[in-house]
Swiss-Prot record:
EC number: 4.3.1.3
Organism: Rhizobium rhizogenes (strain K84 / ATCC BAA-868) (Agrobacterium radiobacter)
Protein name: Histidine ammonia-lyase
Annotated keywords: Cytoplasm, Histidine metabolism, Lyase
Post-translational note: Contains an active site 4-methylidene-imidazol-5-one (MIO), which is formed autocatalytically by cyclization and dehydration of residues Ala-Ser-Gly.
Amino acid sequence: MTITLHPGSVSLKQLAEIYWSGEPAKLDASFDAGILKAAARIAEIAAGNAPVYGINTGFGKLASIKIDSADVATLQRNLILSHCCGVGQPLPENVVRLIMSLKLVSLGRGASGVRLELVRLIEGMLAKGVVPVIPEKGSVGASGDLAPLAHMTAVMMGHGEAFYAGERLDGAAALEKAGLTPVVLAAKEGLALINGTQVSTALALAGLFRAHRAAQAALITGAMSTDAAMGSSAPFHPDIHTLRGHQGQIDTAAALRGLLAGSVIRESHIEGDERVQDPYCIRCQPQVDGACLDLLRSVGRTLEIEANAVTDNPLVLSDNSVVSGGNFHAEPVAFAADQIAIAVCEIGAISQRRIALLVDPALSYGLPAFLAKKPGLNSGLMIAEVTSAALMSENKQMSHPASVDSTPTSANQEDHVSMACHGARRLLQMTDNLFGIVGIEALTAAQGVEFRAPLATSPELTLAIATIRSVVPTLDVDRYMANDLKAASDLVASGALNASVSADILPSLEI
């Protein structure tokens, strides 16, 4: 099913659907008129003699050089090919499809001056599954994501490389096999296509969506760990969180209450438990995970604005003037990526402490050492906990802010840059690590709850444990563990663990 986009009001929900489902996107036809109007204005300038940046001048530090009208098409071609300087592995295909969709939104605002032909080609590539090969490295997140977007644009011209029908082909062959025709760029079109924040924004959105999925799963595993440790649900009382007032904290506490409702384990120790308070990793879940939820929601609003923005340069304004500005600078995206990294780091940190609690007989309230049957003969989940610590610590190192590291480029014309692109790209690795941590908690918590038999956990958590056990059986004796850890991580990453509980329990990304 094709997702129809209305530039200026595209929602996080639509963007998440594009990312997770791979459905193609197209612009609503009502935006064609604005695109055509801006394109006509650019064509008018290109036919004249007055120099206007990006239309009939050089670029960056070469902006003062006037280009002959006969060379305008060559100028755009040279711009794209010279800017194809990306290095590293290709970006994931679902990220590239999101990049292309965001570029559609930006062009659809009618301020870029491209012909409708380019919009139709991007739509056609999405519909037919032509995905440009975009190397992951090469952007500093200012003057747009120039190098990576040049690789996207090169395919539209019949250059570069693209994935199509499971093959990696040269751009011309991919278009031909898909029944699409490459374009010859007209005035400003190359600049409009590469001068934007769509790569950084798509990567940040991918990080956001993945972080939120992991955050939801961590509430399930956190509630499960609470029952496994025979922790108290009293700290999740709604009045406590209403008195503080943070919505993420309120929503997280409500989710934990919903997940634990009906637990026989919980009821068994409400009265007469000699422990006065649980460790913070159990008791302060609403405060920590709730703060992360608030942060992700705030970042979501920033990225939703950016996803609907026009970020190339110069721009065709509503009065038909063409004005140079700096919307290509991705500082808001860089800040957003840094904040997501902090949330990812903290969700993993508190999850890892719950894992450590459950494998430690001094803290786990009667569970065997390392959750092993016959500890000593079996090591149980001893090294799974160590792996979770390794993943947590790697995320701590990766969470250093990227946005504070500017460097001058392009002969000091572009003398302050955002570093948004690699700041956002690291979120893919960080969320992979987080999926691994939460997956390990799923294994430790499920094993811990099973040791409490015949006491039963809640109906919701029983469903979650059944989902875990559908991919990883109970650990009765030591076995090769790497496959178990991967299966648990994949379960979290796929969203299947979240889908195992009632849909209305887990807090959404949008308030």
